Amino acid sequence: MLAELPARSDREPVVGAGMGGDDTTAIDAAVERAVVARLDADGGGFTLVSEELGVRPGGETWVVLDPIDGSINAKRGLPFFSLSVAVAEGPTMGDVTFGYVYDFGSGEEWTAERGRGARLNGEPLRGEPPKDRIEILALEATRTDLVAGHTPSLVDFVHRLRIFGSLAISLCHLADGRVDAVCSLKAARAVDIAAAQLLVRERGYAIDLPEAPPFEAAPLDLEGRSRVVAAGTTGLCAAMAAALSE
């Protein structure tokens, strides 16, 4: 897919408006077409929820697709963007049974099955156990004013920040112990986290949507939005949520 769109001038033209409300770029559309075609070819009806196409009813199984998480990185050639696919047995976050995240930059494939753990390139995740402090926080935000407005409340319990530009990749890094917590200052949709959240939860880590219903009841749709906090322990996750409210 990327070989067909090698240059920035190929990837970034706006070709439409996604049902999620954002512009659809050429790379968004190309990846979505390829993934949906593959899913359709595998047969079996499913209800599709995709950032670009919207909701396509079709069966009791739900497939939640984010063709490109980190579109600006993808357009500019920064190697931090991903494909996310989640499979669910119903319309809520708690119904997700399988998650897949592909990191285009590193080539890493992250997967999780409900009740069967999380894996990286087919091997079980065995990262460092969660810490009781945050040495590295993966902060996801699109505007400098959001970062400037919230970082003062983080000073007391966060040592260092990293901003990758892909919420799904950040959550995968948390699941593997590469970062200690994740905080999205911009409200995210279900398509942004449906796959990666399962890796976090299968590791026994905590994740919350402060502006949404209880996490498991959060709908798999394109309307609901909430900031996201996640950490290795429920205490750290609660501290992050409290910092957001300040």
Where are these regions (language model features)?
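Oxyanion/phosphate-interacting regions
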Residues: M1-D10, P152-V155, C172-E246
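Residue-level signal for inorganic ion chemistry
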Residues: D28, L39, S71, D103, ...
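Glycine-rich active-site/cofactor-binding loop and its immediate structural neighborhood
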Residues: W62-D95
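Acidic beta-strand-loop-alpha-helix segment within the catalytic core
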Residues: S82, A86-C172, E223-E246
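Short glycine-aspartate micro-motif
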Residues: W62-V64, G99-V101, V182
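Short, Asp-centered acidic motifs that coordinate Mg2+ and/or phosphate
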Residues: T47, I136, D180-A181
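General beta-strand structural signal in soluble alpha/beta enzymes
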Residues: T47-E51, L65, A74, R162-G165, ...
